[in-house]
């Protein structure tokens, strides 16, 4: 699984079943920095120490191109970072766990699990 968004770590599967995309890690860091609270950064560091962070590779770029072109052709775009996250997960055959399942479900061939 690739994790996106805030979750209770204790409720998630332990590694190696769960991992975080480097794209998600970047989004989480942006949120932690904007929060301007040391506790946010410390919590994020713990999360990133617990779960493996998966590198975004050139292999993922082809899948991204396929996803973006398909979504645009169907007139069902999703956010640009969500497209990258979807490409990363689909290239690995992974499941995206997200609070934004509705948007990710627009991506053909992507496994999505709603996180509440």
Please annotate each region the language model reported:
Residues 8, 24, 60, 85, ...:
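Alpha-helix capping/helix-boundary segments
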Residues 54-55, 113-115:
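Short acidic-hydrophobic, aromatic-tinged amphipathic segments that line or gate anion-handling sites
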């Amino acid at each position: 699984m690739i994790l996106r968004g805030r979750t209770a770590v204790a409720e998630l599967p332990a590694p190696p079943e769960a991992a975080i995309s480097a794209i998600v890690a970047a989004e989480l860091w942006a949120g932690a920095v904007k929060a301007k609270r040391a506790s946010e950064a410390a919590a994020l560091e713990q999360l990133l120490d617990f779960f493996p962070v998966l590198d975004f590779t050139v292999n993922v770029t082809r899948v991204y191109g396929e996803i973006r072109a398909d979504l645009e052709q169907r007139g069902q775009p999703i956010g640009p970072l969500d497209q990258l996250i979807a490409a990363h997960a689909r290239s690995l055959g992974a499941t995206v766990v997200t609070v934004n399942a509705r948007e990710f479900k627009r991506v053909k061939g992507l496994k999505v699990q709603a996180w509440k």
